[in-house]
Amino acid sequence: MHCDIYKFLKHDDMYIYIARPDYPNDTDEIKDWLGVLPKDFRAGLGRSKFVMHLDLATTPTLARVDKEEVLAKLASQGYFVQLPPQDVMRRQAELRARESQDSIYNT
């Protein structure tokens, strides 16, 4: 299974894997690969940036995620969302809360 990996400027350390089951036979036309994502979810992601193309058949392991879980999600829904580790998510939430409080009290 081939896939493309994207990151999003609004979401540090979150990556989305998009299935490319017909690769390399799907490269002749321009396609919106992110179109497999639910519209509401995609709208909240912001601008995407292509990170890399990956052949999961020749990749022994993946960083921070289970390869079999990725393959199962790609096969069933066409994408896989790799969230940041819990400590990173907690720090980001704390920072957003602090910024929100600062904006309330500094106006």
From Swiss-Prot:
PROSITE patterns, A to Z: YCGL
Pfam families to which the protein is assigned, alphabetical: YcgL (PF05166)
Source domain of life: Bacteria
Gene3D superfamilies per the UniProt record, alphabetical: YcgL domain
Domain named YcgL: residues: 1-95
Signal sequence region: none
Record-given protein name: YcgL domain-containing protein Pcryo_0807
